């Protein structure tokens, strides 16, 4: 099991496996190659919903809608417009991504149950359009005559593409997508996705725009599903709305959950399982979804991290767990330069709060608060529970927009600006409970915010889930310096 996890996490080994499959495809039955192609299409679908749900935390119950848009767009482009196959795939990918970007607008304003219902509605709308637009999609009778590798009518610049060649093209595309996704989730942008998933409020306090992350997540997710749809259309050669109904959306989500939400390798496990499982359940076709339900119950109960959690290898940085913290004095570099600069500006008011009022549905939490925060000084806010201390901090940091009043930072009014804009200007806040990403190392959590001295040298690559509570809080606080 550990060896399987290593294969899917190592670029060279993954490339060698792809070459072996590409060569082996020419020596196995056509039906087997066809199944392998289905596996890759399902991997693309699973990776798409994983970017949206597993990494950025936006649940989707209508992902088959993006799948359908890509399939019909590519089929129409080739069949009706005579567009070359590669161009048709590009149109399918960017067309579905554009729809995802449009959907991100209203979807970004709702959460949890309402987000699930909105995504469900999107999937149902696409399904009904595919049924009713008979002149475009063929309606319930389906769209026939699509250039297909299965029947030998698909060509790329004059070259005929058979089932084996089609699989090899899919394999190359999958390899490129996997490498791009792996690099993406390790980048600053990928860390921003995880931050929004864990806590949108904390992400905003780090200068991360939640709206921008959601737009990117919907666009990437929709694009991957559209790419999968384009490949599906030209492999089957026939499209019907029933291939993109509600149950298809549920299958895609279940596939990702079983594999392991948030794990790129887990999506491969889930796709392989849910490509071959229906073949084994054909004798129990009437009970297929009961079996799916039982699998979900099993996963949620015994394997909450999915198959990826079962197969995940032990982190190669586990040796850091045995290290002891260095003396606090040794870990802290001198701050004399910063302190001297602070003294020089000590008479200046960096933040000025003027007559700020904050009301929640008529309940006044802040009533004309005014104060100044000066450079180089420490200001304490004291009061009993419910007196509005946290509300004032939230208003200053942009989490709440004040009902009235002004908040000046370096002479500019920042009242009402979103929290990520306030953080980018230079004002951030910490939280009583550490809101970092548990699966990230300390270093990765620090990198989500401005890099500063952390005093965490013994734990630079240790998962914060296993770090002591005080150290987790310190890591979270230092990332906002």
Which residues does each predicted region cover?
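Helix-to-loop junction immediately C-terminal to a conserved catalytic motif
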Residues: 397
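Conserved Walker
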Residues: 390-391
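Conserved structural motif at the start of ABC-family nucleotide-binding domains
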Residues: 351-353, 366
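Transmembrane alpha-helices and adjacent helix-loop boundaries
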Residues: 1-333
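Conserved ABC transporter NBD signature motif
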Residues: 405-412, 425
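The feature captures the beta-strand-to-loop junction immediately N-terminal to the Walker
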Residues: 379-384
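ABC-family P-loop ATPase nucleotide-binding domains
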Residues: 440-481
């Amino acid at each position: 099991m550990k060896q399987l996890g290593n294969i899917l996490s190592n670029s060279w080994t993954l490339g060698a496996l792809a070459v072996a499959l590409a060569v082996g495809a020419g020596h196995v039955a056509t039906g087997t190659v066809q199944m392998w192609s289905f596996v890759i299409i399902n991997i693309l679908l699973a990776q798409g919903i994983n970017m949206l749900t597993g990494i950025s935390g936006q649940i989707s119950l209508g992902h088959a809608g993006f799948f359908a848009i890509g399939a019909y767009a590519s089929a129409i482009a080739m069949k009706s417009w005579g567009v070359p196959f590669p161009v048709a795939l590009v149109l399918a990918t960017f067309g579905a991504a554009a729809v995802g970007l449009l959907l991100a607008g209203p979807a970004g304003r709702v959460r949890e149950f309402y987000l699930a219902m909105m995504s469900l509605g999107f999937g149902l709308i696409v399904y009904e359009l595919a049924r009713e637009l008979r002149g475009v999609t063929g309606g319930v009778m389906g769209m026939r005559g699509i250039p297909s590798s299965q029947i030998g009518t698909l060509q790329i610049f004059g070259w005929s593409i058979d089932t084996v060649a089609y699989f090899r093209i899919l394999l190359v595309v999958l390899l490129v997508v996997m490498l791009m996704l792996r690099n993406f989730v390790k980048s600053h942008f990928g860390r921003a996705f995880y931050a929004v998933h864990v806590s949108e409020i904390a992400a905003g306090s780090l200068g991360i725009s939640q709206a921008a992350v959601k737009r990117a997540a919907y666009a990437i997710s929709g694009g991957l599903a559209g790419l999968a749809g384009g490949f599906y259309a030209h492999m089957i050669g026939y499209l019907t709305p029933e291939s993109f109904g509600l149950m298809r959306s549920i299958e895609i989500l279940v596939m990702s959950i079983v594999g392991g939400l948030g794990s790129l390798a887990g999506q491969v496990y889930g796709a392989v399982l849910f490509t071959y499982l229906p073949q084994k359940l054909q004798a129990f076709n009437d009970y297929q979804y009961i079996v799916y339900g039982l699998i979900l119950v099993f996963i949620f109960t015994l394997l909450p991290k999915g198959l990826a959690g079962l197969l995940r290898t032990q982190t190669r940085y586990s040796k850091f767990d045995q290290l002891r913290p260095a003396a606090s004095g040794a870990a802290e570099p001198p701050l004399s330069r910063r302190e001297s600069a602070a003294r020089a500006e000590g008479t200046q008011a960096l933040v000025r709060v003027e007559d700020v009022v904050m009301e929640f549905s008529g309940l006044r939490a802040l009533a004309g608060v005014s104060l100044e925060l000066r450079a180089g000084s420490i200001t304490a806010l004291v009061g009993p529970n419910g007196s509005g201390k946290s509300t004032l901090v939230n208003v200053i940091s942009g989490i709440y927009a004040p009902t009235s009043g002004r908040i000046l930072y370096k002479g500019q009014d920042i009242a009402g600006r979103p929290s990520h804009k306030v953080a980018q200007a230079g004002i951030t806040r910490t939280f009583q409970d550490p809101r970092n990403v548990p699966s990230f190392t300390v270093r990765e959590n620090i990198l989500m915010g401005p890099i500063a001295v952390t005093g965490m040298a013994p734990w630079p690559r240790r998962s914060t889930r296993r770090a002591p509570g005080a150290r987790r809080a310190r890591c979270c606080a230092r990332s906002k310096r």
